[in-house]
Each structure stands twice: as C-alpha cells, then as structure tokens.
Amino acid sequence: MWKKHLVSLGYGYKLGVDLPGESRGFIPNAQFYNKIYGEGRWSANTIISIAIGQGEILATPLQIANLCATIANRGWFITPHVVKAIQDTIMPSQYLEKRIPTIDRQHFEDVAEGMRMAVTGGTCRLANLPGIEVCGKTGTAQNPHGKDHSAFIGFAP
C-alpha cells in the first residue's frame, strides 16, 4: 500500500521531464528485503529508518522538489517539463494535466502546517522571513566518508 502512495507522489519512476538521463529513483519492496535479509528474517523494525529518510528509498532532487510542490498545492502536481519559451496562451495538455496522489487532501494541509512550524520555531528558523509565510523542511544525509550533506526545501504558500 505504501509503495502505491509513493508512486502516486512521483517516486519510483521517471517523471518524464524532457531531460536526458533522468533517474527513476528506487522504492524497495518485500522481494528486495527478502533478498537482503532472507525471507521472513526482516520486519517493520528492520526498515523503520525509512521513516526518517535513512533507509533504502532513493529519490532524485527533482522528485523531492515535485513532492514539495504537491504539498504546496495541497494535493496535486503537474509533471515538470523543460520549455524554451511560451509563445501563445494555448498550452499543450501535457503541460496542464494535474496528477492527484492517492493520499487524502487533508494530510497535505497537516504536513504544510508542520513545515510552517519548522520555519517559525524548528530547524528552519533561518528561513523565517518578515512578511512572507514560508514552509520548509531540513534534512541531513549522513556521509560515512566525510562531512554530512545538509539540505533545505521550502515554499511560500
């Protein structure tokens, strides 16, 4: 079920952004964990680190930005595309098609509120700009070979 939700959010497949070399990322499934740990030798406790971004899920920066846009839109996204110019007001339908994830819209409100609280009193306080409502999320990828990698993503609803 969770994989279905992740796919509906744009993870685990190529978004189709008109750029060469786009990666689909990776969403592990039971077969993957059976291969690594052995059938019946893993459980939710084995993979709980996925919940904090330290598991086996791989996502491209564009997939993460697209998820952030989905949260900002409160439950929809349009596949990102690269365009050189827009010359008239008639847009091809591929640039306008809204994708609706399988997650209830109210959950996006809750996540956006949490991202706002992260900016007003959490790890994103430096993004708290006077007169602009900003929602944000920080993250750190641990690097066993050197310095950790820190990231910030946000939007202004």
Regions found by a protein language model. Give the residues of each.
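Beta-lactam-recognizing serine transpeptidase/beta-lactamase-like catalytic domain environment
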Residues: 1-157
